[in-house]
Every structure is written in C-alpha cells, then in structure tokens.
C-alpha cells in the first residue's frame, strides 16, 4: 500500500515541474525583443527542493518570426523604390529649410548682441567724457573756503517776480476794507486806560479813595444819629420851655449839614477844602 502512493507522488511532482518549466520558457520568449538581437545566455537553473534527481525538459522553439528573416525584407508597407526616393527628397528639403532658419536666427541673434555691445560702449564713452569735463572744471579756479563746493559759480535760475496785488475797484470792496480797519483800530484812550489799570500807583490811589469814602460815610451816620437825638431833646425842651437846648440843637444841625455835604462831595475835594476851613 505504501509503494503505490510513493509512485503517484513522484509522477505528480514531475508533471507539475514540467508545466512550470513550460510557463517559464513562454514568459522568457515573450520578454525577449524580436528585432534581431541575440538572446542572452540562460543561467543554469537551480533545481527546486525535492527535485534534485529530476531534469527540466528542453524549452520549445518560439513561433514568432524575426524581422530579418521574413519574406518582405523590412518592406512591410510594400512601397516601390520611386516612392521611397520621393519621400527621401521631401524629407531632405524639409531638413534643409529648418537648418537655414536656424542659421538665420543665429545671424540675427549675433547682430542684436553686437548692437547692444556697441550701445554699451558708447554709453561708457559718454560717461568718461562727462567725468573729464567735471575734472577740468574742478581744476579751474580756486576754493575760498575748505567747505566751498567747486562748480557752484553757475548762474542760478532767477526767482519769479511776485505779482503786485491790484487794489479793488468796486465801492463794496472799499467799504469792506474800511469796516475791517475800523474793527482793527485802537484808540489812544483805550491804550491809556489799559496801562492805567495795570499801574500800581493808580491802584493804591483807588484804594485810598475807597477808604476815605467809608470814613466819611461812617461820620455822616454818626452825625445823623446825633441830630436825631438833638431833635428829640429839642422837642422835649420846647415842651418844657428850655432855651439852651435850642442853641445847642442849632449847632448840631450845622455840623450834621456839613457832614452830609462832605459825604456827597468826592474825597479829593474834601481834602482840598479842609485847610480852608
């Protein structure tokens, strides 16, 4: 029972190995190029595990035809020699035209580069000429101070003359100007008044006048009070018939009258009138 099973396993393994080898050969044939290149030498295949004694079968030949060996000899389109000559002529003319265009482009590029180089050279020459002229100007003349800048003797542009303002011709403008002048004008009395306000002597005099007025007012009040008291006494004396009280009453009336006059007049006049009395 054991021997037949072992024989069956060996036959199955040999058939599977042969199928694998065929598939590998087909893949290699499909992968190799078919345009006349020689096939690379195949490396020695390593025997798989368990198949050391078995040998791989030889690969089958490829059924694909090679280009160098078919009947048409590369003329797959089956063209005539005249057609091939015509196509070659057209291709040559096309190549010649493209080459000519490239040469013309190169010529124009070279001409443009030469023109740019020429312009740069001219610009450098002009700059050098300007520098030489500036150096000559600096050498001419002398410097008055070490801070003086050379070449500053050129005439500067004269400033534009300012236009004179023409006086207004209409009467309305003249009236407006007169009104403005009146508003801006200041009289001499206003100036003197402002200066007197800020003068300290004037302030002291005003304070003295106020004090004198207060004193005169107090004196007048006292005289009025005395006069009222005398009137009351006179009334009482007239009732009693006393002549002395009537004389004293007259004197007090005179004093009260003088006090009233002094309170009504300004303190400067009162001070001037006191020595006369």
Curated annotation (Swiss-Prot):
<feature type="region of interest" description="Disordered">
    <location>
        <begin position="1"/>
        <end position="81"/>
    </location>
</feature>
<dbReference type="GO" id="GO:0030178">
    <property type="term" value="P:negative regulation of Wnt signaling pathway"/>
</dbReference>
<dbReference type="Pfam" id="PF23999">
    <property type="entry name" value="CUSTOS"/>
</dbReference>
<keyword id="KW-0217">Developmental protein</keyword>
<feature type="modified residue" description="Phosphoserine">
    <location>
        <position position="158"/>
    </location>
</feature>
<feature type="modified residue" description="Phosphoserine">
    <location>
        <position position="62"/>
    </location>
</feature>
<comment type="similarity">
    <text>Belongs to the CUSTOS family.</text>
</comment>
<keyword id="KW-0175">Coiled coil</keyword>
<feature type="compositionally biased region" description="Basic and acidic residues">
    <location>
        <begin position="115"/>
        <end position="142"/>
    </location>
</feature>
<feature type="coiled-coil region">
    <location>
        <begin position="106"/>
        <end position="141"/>
    </location>
</feature>
<feature type="region of interest" description="Disordered">
    <location>
        <begin position="108"/>
        <end position="182"/>
    </location>
</feature>
<feature type="compositionally biased region" description="Low complexity">
    <location>
        <begin position="265"/>
        <end position="277"/>
    </location>
</feature>
<dbReference type="GO" id="GO:0060061">
    <property type="term" value="P:Spemann organizer formation"/>
</dbReference>
<feature type="compositionally biased region" description="Low complexity">
    <location>
        <begin position="9"/>
        <end position="18"/>
    </location>
</feature>
<feature type="modified residue" description="Phosphoserine">
    <location>
        <position position="238"/>
    </location>
</feature>
<comment type="function">
    <text>Plays a role in the regulation of Wnt signaling pathway during early development.</text>
</comment>
<feature type="modified residue" description="Phosphothreonine">
    <location>
        <position position="80"/>
    </location>
</feature>
<feature type="compositionally biased region" description="Basic residues">
    <location>
        <begin position="248"/>
        <end position="258"/>
    </location>
</feature>
<feature type="region of interest" description="Disordered">
    <location>
        <begin position="238"/>
        <end position="277"/>
    </location>
</feature>
<feature type="compositionally biased region" description="Basic and acidic residues">
    <location>
        <begin position="63"/>
        <end position="72"/>
    </location>
</feature>
<keyword id="KW-0597">Phosphoprotein</keyword>
<protein>
    <recommendedName>
        <fullName>Protein CUSTOS</fullName>
    </recommendedName>
</protein>
<feature type="short sequence motif" description="Nucleolar localization signal (NLS)">
    <location>
        <begin position="249"/>
        <end position="256"/>
    </location>
</feature>
<keyword id="KW-0539">Nucleus</keyword>
<dbReference type="GO" id="GO:0016055">
    <property type="term" value="P:Wnt signaling pathway"/>
</dbReference>
<dbReference type="GO" id="GO:0005635">
    <property type="term" value="C:nuclear envelope"/>
</dbReference>
<dbReference type="InterPro" id="IPR026694">
    <property type="entry name" value="CUSTOS"/>
</dbReference>
<keyword id="KW-0879">Wnt signaling pathway</keyword>
């Amino acid at each position: 029972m054991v021997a037949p099973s072992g024989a069956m396993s060996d036959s199955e393994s040999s058939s599977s190995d042969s199928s694998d080898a065929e598939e590998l050969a087909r893949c290699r044939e499909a992968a190799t190029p078919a345009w006349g290149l020689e096939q690379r030498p195949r490396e020695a295949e390593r025997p798989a595990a368990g198949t050391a004694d078995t040998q791989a079968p030889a690969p089958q030949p490829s059924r694909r035809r090679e280009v160098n060996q078919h009947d048409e000899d590369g003329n797959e389109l089956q063209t005539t020699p005249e057609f091939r000559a015509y196509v070659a002529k057209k291709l040559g003319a096309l190549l010649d035209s493209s080459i000519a265009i490239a040469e013309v482009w190169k010529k124009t590029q070279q001409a443009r580069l030469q023109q740019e180089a020429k312009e740069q050279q001219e610009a450098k020459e002009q700059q050098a000429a300007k520098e030489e002229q500036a150096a000559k100007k600096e050498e001419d003349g002398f410097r008055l101070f070490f801070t003086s800048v050379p070449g500053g003797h050129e005439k500067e542009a004269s400033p534009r003359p300012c236009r004179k303002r023409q006086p207004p011709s209409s009467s309305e403008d003249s009236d407006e100007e007169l009104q403005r002048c009146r508003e801006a004008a200041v009289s001499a009395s206003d100036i003197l008044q402002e200066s007197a306000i800020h003068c300290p002597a004037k302030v002291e005099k005003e304070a003295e006048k106020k004090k004198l007025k207060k004193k005169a007012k107090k004196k007048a009040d006292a005289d009025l009070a005395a006069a009222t008291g005398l009137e009351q006494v006179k009334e009482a004396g007239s009732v009693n018939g006393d002549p002395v009280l009537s004389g004293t009453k007259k004197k007090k009336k005179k004093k009260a009258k003088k006090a009233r006059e002094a309170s009504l007049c300004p303190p400067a006049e009162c001070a001037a009138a006191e020595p006369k009395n």
